[in-house]
Curated annotation (Swiss-Prot):
One of its GO terms (cellular component) is extracellular region. Changing residue 420 to W: Does not acquire new sulfoxidase activity. PANTHER family: DEFERROCHELATASE, DEFERROCHELATASE/PEROXIDASE. Changing residue 420 to H: Does not acquire new sulfoxidase activity. This is Dye-decolorizing peroxidase AauDyP1. It is an enzyme of class 1 (oxidoreductase). Pfam families: DyP_N (PF21105), Dyp_perox_C (PF20628). Optimum pH is 4.5 for oxidation of 2,6-dimethoxyphenol. Retains 100% activity after incubation at pH 2.5 for 4 hours. Retains >60% activity after incubation at pH 2-11 at 4 degrees Celsius. Retains >60% activity after incubation at pH 3-9 at room temperature. The active site is at 229 (proton acceptor). One of its GO terms (molecular function) is heme binding. It comes from Auricularia auricula-judae. Binds 1 heme b (iron(II)-protoporphyrin IX) group non-covalently. Its EC number is 1.11.1.19, 1.11.1.7. The lineage of its organism: Eukaryota, Fungi, Dikarya, Basidiomycota, Agaricomycotina.
């Protein structure tokens, strides 16, 4: 006998309640006209060797977090295969609220649903709102985040960034929200978009959209420059099973109103997270040419020496192997091993942490954005320093692979890059802090010799001017390089990803 999905969902809810596992939000079934319905046989998420795995159903069952009420993208991380970011404006708040409550809230994918293939939808739908979007809905509550309230365009100067290169729709506060769709095929996402647009009708207008996809074949999990991305995700205390060297943070660092969130939130906003979205173009052919032109002297082929320079700029080889553990040559087996590839602190016996750059430059991207022992934390993993400045990354590459013509001319002709997504409970301690206080700060990490470290060679910004970076050449750590901007921001927005109960509750009232 074949049981219907509705019966299975109801039976699961009854069993969970009987076992004491029920959360505050009742099981939901995808009977909304806004949903693309069907039975999923394979996961819409992809585990990649070397990255922290997708949260399991067992972890979800054991946690005290209300994972039925937390939108799935917040804690799933960088595991989506296909994704669409649909940015919209609200034209008719009353009609929008009606459909938000009746058609969208019932099908928003939770962490619980995404942890098990049996409960995953064909298309995972999440939704988040800008401050102007909340105001359009009549929600004036103070969420306790001034950066969110002001919007990302007003924050651009903090990052030494001009909005002249931004997508026009981001250069203001006109975007009210973003619907995030994830699946394993573009066709399913297209069907979901058609359903959403039919449901909302003229109550919303699409302002902009960005399609994104995991890279093909062996490049799955790698960003457009070719480096395995997302290894250093934090582990949430009481939810994730920490990997060796993984930063362990309280849930309140990522989830509003959770353990050790220092800000008092409106009751309806407990269980949400602030979403920083950035469209970051990557000039891959130009980046590769720069590495060849500036490859350090030494033995080995020109390409091998160029790869070494790239690894020292990032802090990892393309495989994900950290140069702090393998400073002169890639070790793909290490890169693919999540039990080893994050288990380091930058401290080495017999080497001075304040002056040694033979293992890893002070300016390397991953050292700038997670300094480990540089901030005086434990010299033994896991290093808990800077836990309050952790973010949960959930981005994905966008755009086509580099063409042979682009490689031959060393010139980008088709846009590609990273749809950067970061979740945190405080933007001022998360994304904003990492970019402004660490990546864009030439004197960070502190207490080093020489004191001027230089900007983050990957994401550091200098108002469009060349960035001076020190310590990248292994034979001369005092030498500096002037590095063009190979990651170009096309802007973004700050959103609040509310708890699911608020989507059909406070935001629809």
């Amino acid at each position: 006998m074949r049981l219907s999905p509705v019966f299975v969902a109801l039976l699961s809810g009854l069993l969970a309640a009987d076992l004491g596992l029920a959360r505050s939000v009742a099981p939901r079934v995808a009977d909304s006209p806004a949903a693309v319905t069907g039975t999923r046989k394979t996961s819409l998420l992809k585990n990649v060797a070397g990255l922290p795995p997708v949260p399991s159903a067992a972890q979800v069952a054991a946690t005290s977090l209300n994972t039925d009420d937390i939108q799935g993208d917040i804690l799933v991380g960088m595991h989506k295969q296909k994704q669409l970011f649909y940015f919209f404006a609200i034209n008719d708040p009353a009609t929008f609220k009606t459909h938000l409550a009746s058609d969208i809230a019932p099908v928003v994918a939770s962490v619980t649903q995404l942890s098990n293939v049996a409960t995953q939808p064909l298309v995972a739908l999440n939704i988040a709102f800008s401050n102007t979007g909340l105001l359009a809905l009549g929600v004036t509550d103070n969420l306790g985040d001034s950066l969110f309230a002001n919007g990302q365009a007003k924050d651009a100067t903090s990052f030494k960034e001009s909005t002249s290169s931004w997508v026009p729709q981001f250069a203001g506060t006109g975007i009210h929200g973003v619907i995030i769709l994830a699946s394993d095929t573009t066709d399913l996402i297209d069907q979901q978009v058609a359903s959403i647009e039919s449901t909302f009708g003229s109550s919303i207008s699409k302002l902009y959209s960005l399609s994104a996809s995991i890279r093909p074949g062996n490049e799955a999990g790698h960003e457009m420059f070719g480096f395995l991305d997302g290894i250093a995700q934090p582990a949430i205390n009481g939810f994730n099973t920490p990997l060796p060297g993984q930063n362990i943070v309280d849930a309140g660092v990522i989830i509003t109103g959770a353990t050790n969130d220092p800000i008092t939130r409106p009751s309806w906003a407990v269980g949400g997270s602030f979403l920083a979205f950035r469209q970051l173009e990557q000039l891959v052919p130009e980046f590769n040419k720069y590495l060849l032109d500036n490859a350090p002297a030494g033995s080995g082929s020109l390409q091998a020496r160029a790869d070494l320079l790239g690894a020292r700029m990032v802090g990892r080889w393309k495989s994900g192997a950290p140069i702090d553990l393998t400073p002169t040559a890639d070790d793909p087996a290490l890169g693919a091993d999540a039990q080893r590839n994050n288990n380091f602190t930058y401290s080495h016996a017999g080497f001075d942490l304040g002056s040694d750059q033979s293992h890893c430059p002070f300016s390397a991207h991953i050292r700038k954005t997670r300094p480990r022992a540089d901030l005086g934390g434990s010299l033994t993993p896991p290093n808990l320093s800077a836990g309050a400045n952790s973010i949960m990354r959930s981005g994905i590459p966008y755009g086509p692979e580099v063409t042979s013509a682009e490689s031959a001319s060393n010139t980008t002709t088709q846009e590609r890059g990273l749809a950067f997504v970061a979740y945190q409970a405080q933007l001022s301690q998360g994304f904003h802090f990492l970019q402004q206080t660490w990546a864009d700060n030439a004197n960070f990490p502190p207490g080093k010799t020489p004191a001027t470290v230089g900007l983050d060679p990957i994401i550091g910004q200098n108002n469009g001017q060349p960035r001076v970076v020190n310590g990248l050449l292994p034979s001369n750590s005092s030498a500096s390089l002037s590095i063009p901007q190979f990651v170009v921001s096309h802007g973004g927005e700050y959103f609040f990803s509310p708890p699911i109960s608020a989507i059909g509750g406070r935001l629809s009232a």
